[in-house]
């Protein structure tokens, strides 16, 4: 007998869908979600396209522009659904901007941003295989450290 698990839809909040498989916990951590908010997390769920995806549902959360940029860095194919009174009022795919300020930390220990209290500034050089360049030291980074 085939068993199904039904998850109650959220009334007001955000659903982050099509998160790359096994990356929802990373998305959860970088969003610094309040512990009291009801959260539903689904890991490695088969999508209609036949690939594995994660889903994160957060009741009562409205994402900021920085939040969406952080999600795009971790899972560039994610989709955001804004829910009001049980209905999707807005749906969009995340998209990396050309430049990201303040949310990434440079991995170069000699970069001025690691020696002084300066916010990191990065150019997105390539989106499909993520390539990011620090605007201070010019170093290309491939391991992302979210700073806040």
From Swiss-Prot:
One GO term describing the cellular component: aspartate carbamoyltransferase complex
Keyword vocabulary terms for this entry: Metal-binding, Pyrimidine biosynthesis, Zinc
One GO term of the biological process aspect: 'de novo' pyrimidine nucleobase biosynthetic process
TM stretches of this protein: none
GO molecular function: metal ion binding
Gene3D superfamilies xref list: Aspartate carbamoyltransferase regulatory subunit, C-terminal domain (2.30.30.20), Aspartate carbamoyltransferase regulatory subunit, N-terminal domain (3.30.70.140)
The UniProt record lists the keyword Zinc: yes
Cofactor(s) required, per the database record: Zn(2+)
NCBIfam families xrefs: ATCase_reg
HAMAP family xrefs: Asp_carb_tr_reg
Function in brief: Involved in allosteric regulation of aspartate carbamoyltransferase.
Protein name in UniProt: Aspartate carbamoyltransferase regulatory chain
Protein's gene: pyrI
């Amino acid at each position: 007998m085939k068993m199904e698990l039904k998850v109650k839809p959220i009334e007001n909040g955000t659903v982050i869908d099509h998160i790359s498989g096994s990356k929802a916990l990373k998305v959860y951590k970088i969003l610094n979600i309040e512990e009291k908010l009801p959260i539903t997390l689904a890991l490695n769920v088969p999508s209609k396209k036949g690939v594995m995806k994660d889903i994160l549902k957060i009741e009562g959360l409205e994402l900021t522009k920085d939040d969406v940029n952080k999600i795009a860095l971790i899972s560039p194919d994610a989709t955001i659904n804004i829910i009001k009174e049980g209905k999707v009022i807005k749906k969009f795919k995340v998209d990396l901007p050309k430049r990201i300020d303040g949310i990434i930390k440079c991995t170069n220990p000699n970069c001025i941003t690691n020696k002084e209290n300066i916010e990191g500034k990065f150019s997105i050089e390539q989106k499909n295989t993520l390539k990011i360049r620090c605007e201070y030291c010019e170093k290309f980074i491939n391991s992302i450290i979210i700073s806040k």
